[in-house]
Each structure stands twice: as structure tokens, then as C-alpha cells.
Amino acid sequence: MSDEQDQGETKGRLSLRPVNRGELGRTVDAGSVRQSFSHGRSKVVQVEVRKKRGGAAGAETGRPSAPSRASGGAAAPRGLTAAEQAARQRAVVEQQREAARLEAERREQEKISILSAAEEARRKAEEEARAAEEAERLRAEEEARRREEEEAERRRAAEASQATAAPPAPAAAASPRAAMPAPTAAPARPGAAPARRTAPVPPATSASETLRLRAARTGRDEEEEASRPARRPGSGAAPSRKPSVPAPKKVGDDRRRGARIDVQAALSGDDERVRSLASVRRQRDRERRQAELERLRSDQVRVVREVVLPETITVQELANRMAARVPEVVKSLMKLGVMATATQTIDADTAELVVEEFGHRSKRVSESDVELGLEGQEDSETDLKVRPPVVTIMGHVDHGKTSLLDALRSTDVAAREAGGITQHIGAYQVTLESGAKMTFIDTPGHEAFTAMRARGASVTDIVILVVAADDGVMPQTVEAIRHAKAANVPIIVAINKIDRPDANPNRVRSELLQYDIAVEAMGGETQDVEVSALKRQGLDALQEAILLQAELLDLKANPNRSAEGAVIESSLDRGRGPVATVLVQKGTLRQGDIVVAGTEQGRVRAMLDDHGQPLKDAGPSTPVEILGLSGVPGAGEVFVVVENEGRAREIAEFRQRKLREHAAAAGAAARGTLDQMLARIQAGEQKEVALVIKADVQGSAEAIQATVQKLGNDEVRVRVLLAGVGQITESDVQLAKASDAIIVAFNVRANAQARTLASRDGVDIRYYSIIYQVSDDIETMVKGKLAPIEREKFLGYAEIRQVFNITKVGKVAGCYVTEGLVKRGAGVRLLREGVVIHQGELSQLKRFKDDVREVARGYECGLSFAGFSDLREGDVVECYETETVPA
């Protein structure tokens, strides 16, 4: 019966799950409980218990299976085998392990989320604190500013009322409201914040000021009321507030402050119309700005500056130096009658007037003042340290100067010089076996390199005068002696080539006496050493003499200062740009220093020694090659390290401008006036040979220029259009073509474009490597430009003994040839009492009615002069002919 009842209940129940579904995946258990209330009341409540899926599954899995009920009867269930039990046990263990792992991960996630939430909360709290602090600071600043404005308004209102007020009695009568006692303030309610204390209002406050202050107080009260926390319901009755005394009603106040206005109130004349608060604020702002402007105009102290005025200055620069606006400066110039723009240049006098008008002090300076303080201060004795000597080797050409230097350096420089003569000035540093250092400067001996020798003598400490024992004193030897004495430099005589069979050192010593050089062997003070550069004889004695002389001179310099020195040689390298060989005389030159060398400036990008090795710094008496200059400096120029690029550029531009002015003045003086130049050109009196000189180094270009300019004369002038360094370019060819010039290339070549252009335009490019070849060729060109010389050749004299007057011919002189001969067609002069009265040609020459070509001495002849008939007896006829001789 119970089974049938169960089946009936099962059929009548609606369920979405099958009856036999397993309970492994079920996570919710439902049930009902009875909830009890007061007074015996109760209620049945449905309750659900949720379980974790893993745990439920494990529990269900771990629970032993109930024996299945057989459909036909109660047969005993089949038992599990050992393998099935072991598998089930393993599954249970794995499921428990997985559940433990998931639980650990969940706890870790909860911990991370808790930490993240705490960090986020802390960050938000910090941001809120910072925002609150910033808001508090802004509020405090606004409050302070508002208080200052209110205080300023009160002061201005008080000053205005005092200025416009009448005597005390009428004022009191006119404003009875000011004498009324102030209404008593209402007592503060309990628990309220203390009222803000306000500054007392002056008794003479204007109506508009009163309105403004009252509006401000009303706004603050509203803000305080809004900021008070609302009272919670049920917190008790609020304390009773005593009614405050109403403010006195002001005429026109309701209509302005009210939310609306009717037509009757607007048209009625009971109250007086007043200005709005916005209008009052605008008026106060205008008054405040006007007062501030007046105060600035009256009380402001003008800054008086000292304005430095060069010889010329632009309007923009003048305005910058006065800290003024450019339009104001232009307006001031217009008042002076000068119409100028911002970029226009004005003179120092006009600029001084403008500076005085602006109330500043002017200081006139010259352009040359940019070089003041360029060389620095003198060094103290404590800063000086011993430096190596600088030795210059000088002498006549081919006397062995470079060979002697080679022997000292153990190198072979002379073999690389064209023609066996030195055409560059070179600087080298030699380290002796003892560790002592010497700096040698090799100078050319050719007569064209006088300027190079002068430069070498000016930067040196000791001069070694090389004289060949078999040749004696020569012209360039004398010149070297003159340069050394002009520079006040001690001389050491090196008598070279003593290995020659015809060497005579004593003759050299005797010849030097003529030029005030007395060697020690002749009782003087000048050291002399007999050496042989080829055999390397006497080199040790020469080094000892140099060191002894250097010790006597006590050579010192300060290495801890900005570098100064001299440019020994300069050139333009195709790959490296402008290269200058400099000799540091003071301080230490470092890579990256900003230097000024003559008209060029730049930053030292690299330094190389005489062996081509890079250097970071160079001390006193060190010769180096520097790279990085803006151009090729002139040889012999002084280089100085300056503090910044601006000053270096200013000094270089000033020197370039002076050089251009000097060149223009020299050219104008050489050409004379324009009228004289045009007259010479038209008459063809003076011709010229135009040259474009390009050399490998600056010294060679200078030497060639000086040599060729000496070859000019009164009829042919040698004009050097350009003397530069570097290879020949297209611009050089174009310059030569425009001036019909010849390009002289000394140890340089033309690039492909320049060669093509020169071949097309017919420009002559001549290449040289020895300087005397240049001199010979230019001299030949100058002679070729000379006009041929007409030379007069005397033929003879004839005396007029009788004058005949022949019809259709005119007067004919019967003459007797007293000397030489008379030739027909030759030139004649008619002399009367030793004075030439006519010069012309013979038109006819006859002897006994026959025309003859010439008549010799002792014969008579008849002469007829072309275009002249004033013949007298006793006149003498001089006969000559003109022949042309090449110049």
C-alpha cells in the first residue's frame, strides 16, 4: 500500500529533474523552519542551504553507494573489486587535492583584493587631503586678497570724503544719518559659530560704498548659512531665535533688490533712481586703475642705465641696450628729423641724443675697444715654470739648414722639399737623450721668403745662424743677422759643411766681424760650433750650446692660463679644411677652446703634433696643428683663446672690416684719381699683368705676391687679383677670365671642373713647384708687355751754302755734306745758330739734277724739305734715322 502511495505521489509531483538523477552536482538543499514571534504567533519559512560544488561532489563521491534495488526482487548487490576501490580512492584524493588548491587560490585572491582596496583607499585619501589643502590655501589667499581690497576701498573712500567734506558743523547737519547710533546686533543663537568681526566703517562712507559693503556682508551670511549642517529630525527642538532688528529701509532699495517690479512702482516718483551695483563696481575699478597709473607716473623711479655706444649702431640694438621699445626709439628719432627703421644704422652722435632724451647715460667707445684685455694680465713670478727653448734655424739658401735640422731630428725632411730648398716654415719638437726638449723652427733661405724669416725671428728665443764653411757669408746670411738683431735674439753660429775639402771656418769668423758678430774664438761673446750635418759631426756640441744659452735666458712661462701664441704657417686642406700651425707661447691650449687668430676665429676641433699624432692639450713652447678655424689665418698672426664665441666673432669681424678698409685705401692710392686712371687707360701709357695666385700654404702665397710685385715698372704694373691657398676652383677661373689674368698654381692643382672651364674659356693656368721659376716667368711676361724702344741713329751734317727758288718746287737748299752722310727719307732737323727750328723729313735729294738715295761726306747736294721753306744760308741740316729695339 505504501508503494502504491509513493507511486501516486510521484505521478502527481511536477519536477524538472528526473527522479533518479544523481545528487553529485546539486549545490542547494531546501527545507522549511517555523519562526516564532511574540504573543504565541509563528510562521513557516522556506530555507535554502547552499553548499560548495567541490565539497558536495566530494562528499557524494566519498559516500558509499546504496545498494540498488532490483526491479524484480531484492537481489544482493555485487561487491567492488580491489582495483575499482583503489581507483575510487585515488579519484577521491585527487578531488580533495584540487579542492585544497582552489581554496588556496581563492584566499590568495581575497588577500590581493584586500591589499589593492587598501592601497586605493590610501591613495584616494592622500589625493583628497592634497585637494583639501590646495582648496584651503586658495581660500586663504582669496580671503586675504578680499580683505586687502576692502581695506583699500575704505581708505580711498575715507580720503575722498575728507577731501570733499565741508566744515564739521555743516557736514553733521547735512548727514544726520551718520550721527545716528548703530543698531544693536541681534544676540547669537546658542551653538552657532562666533560672528566674524568686521573693521569699523568710517563715518563718512558714501552711499555707494555702503551698498557695496552691505551686499558683501549679505553674501557672506548666505554662504555661512548654507555651510551650516542641516538639523536632523528627531534631534530635539531648535533653540528659539530672537527676532533681529530690521535694517532701515532705503529709498530705491526694494526695486533694485526685488525679484520683480510692477508698472505702478516703476512710474511712481516716490523713490529716486540710483546706479546699479555693476555700474558702481565698474566705476570703482576705473578709479582704482587711474589712481594706480597716476601713482606709477608720479612715484616710479626710472632706472638710469649706462648705454655703451660704438661708432655705429642699429636702432634695434640701441633699443635693446636702453631696455626700451623700438617704436619709442623710432619716434624719438623722428623728432630729431631722422627717419630710420629698426634695422637701420645710425651714428654715435644721433644715438647719444636719443639716449639723453630717454634719461640714460651714454658711454662712447671706439670699435678697437673690442680688443681691450684680449691678451690678459701679466703672470706673477710664482706661477712661472721652466719651458723648452724655441730655436730658429736661419741662413742663406743651400747652406744646410734643413739638413742640420734633419740630423737633430734624425729624419729626412730635405729630400721631400722641391728643388732641395725649403719653401715652407716648419716647427718641430725634439726630445734629447737627457730628456730635455727643444722646439725648432726651420725658415726658408731664398730671398723671396723674407717675411717668413722675419716671423721666425720674432717668435724665437735663440737663432742658429748656419753658414757654409766653403761659401762664407752670403746676402741671406746678412739678412738673417739683421732680423735676429731687430728681434733682440741671441745668435749661435753653426759653421756647416766642415767636411768639405775647401772648408775654411776661420774665413767665416772673419767675415762675420764685418756685421758685428764676434765669436768666442775671436774674443767675442757669440758661441760658434763647427758641425757637419752630412757626417753628423758636432751635433752634441751644438745641443750643449743651445741648452747653455737657454739656461742663461731663464725661459719660463705660466701653463695654468688661457693660451696665447703665434701662427707659424697656415694652409687649406681639402679634407680637413683650414689648418694652422701654431706655437703656444703662454698658457695651455686645449681641444675645444675658442681662439681668435688674426681675422679668423673658431673652436679647436682637433690638435696634432709634428708627427701627426692627436693631442688633447699643448703647453708652452709646443708647436701644434689646429683644425676648426673659420678660414685660413695669416702667417705671423697672434692667436688668443677667448671666453665665448660671441666675442671671438666680434673681434674677427672688426679685424676683417679694418683689413678691407686698408686694402681699399691702398688700392685707391695706387690707382690715383679716377680721372688719372681713365686718362692712362685711354692713352695706353700703362699696361698691367693680372695674376691669380694659389699656393699650398699662406707663407708661399705671400712670398710669391711680394716677389712678382717687385717686377713691375712705370709702363707695366703687376696686379695680384687674389693670393690664396688651396686648389684652383671654378670661381678662380671665372675671376681670371673676367680680368684677363693668368693663374699661378704653386704646389696645387686645379679640380676637374676648373680644368674644363679653363680649357673652354682659354684661361692660362701655370703650375710651379720652385719659386724662382715663378719669378723668371712673370718677369718675361712683364717684358713682353713693354712697348718697343725707338732708338735714334745719327747719320751726318750738311751745311746750307746757297738757297734756290725753283718754280713749282719751292725753295731748294744747296748743301755741302760736312760729316757722315745724308740719306733720302731720313729724318732731319734744321739748326739755326744751334737752335732746332724745324724737324721733319727730306722730300728730295739730288746731285746735279739726278735723284740719289744718299750723299756722302765731301760732296754737294740739293735738299728739299717737306712743308717747310724758311731756309737761310749758314743753317745746318742734321740727318738721322729711327730704329726700333725690343724692350
Curated annotation (Swiss-Prot):
Q: Name one GO cellular component term.
A: cytoplasm
UniProt region (G2), positions on chain:
420-424
Keyword Amino-acid biosynthesis appears in the UniProt entry: no
The subcellular localization recorded is: Cytoplasm
User: Which GO terms of the molecular function aspect are on file?
Assistant: GTP binding; GTPase activity; guanosine tetraphosphate binding; translation initiation factor activity
* Ranges of biased composition (kind: Basic and acidic residues): 95-111, 119-158, 250-259
Q: Which residues form the tr-type G domain?
A: 386-556
Where the protein is mainly located, per its record?
cytoplasm
Extract the ranges annotated as region (G3).
Answer: 442-445
Cite the residue spans of the region called G4: 496-499
Q: Which UniProt keywords apply?
A: Cytoplasm, GTP-binding, Initiation factor, Nucleotide-binding, Protein biosynthesis
Quick one: where's region Disordered? 1-259
Can you tell me which residues bind GTP? 395-402, 442-446, 496-499
Q: Where is the composition biased (Low complexity)?
A: 62-94, 159-210
Q: Which family does it belong to?
A: Belongs to the TRAFAC class translation factor GTPase superfamily. Classic translation factor GTPase family. IF-2 subfamily.
Q: HAMAP family annotated for this entry?
A: IF_2_B (MF_00100_B)
Q: What does this protein do?
A: One of the essential components for the initiation of protein synthesis. Protects formylmethionyl-tRNA from spontaneous hydrolysis and promotes its binding to the 30S ribosomal subunits. Also involved in the hydrolysis of GTP during the formation of the 70S ribosomal complex.
Q: List the PANTHER family hit by this protein, alphabetically.
A: TR-TYPE G DOMAIN-CONTAINING PROTEIN, TRANSLATION INITIATION FACTOR IF-2-RELATED
Know the name of this protein? Translation initiation factor IF-2
The record lists the organism as Acidiphilium cryptum (strain JF-5)
Encoding gene (name):
infB
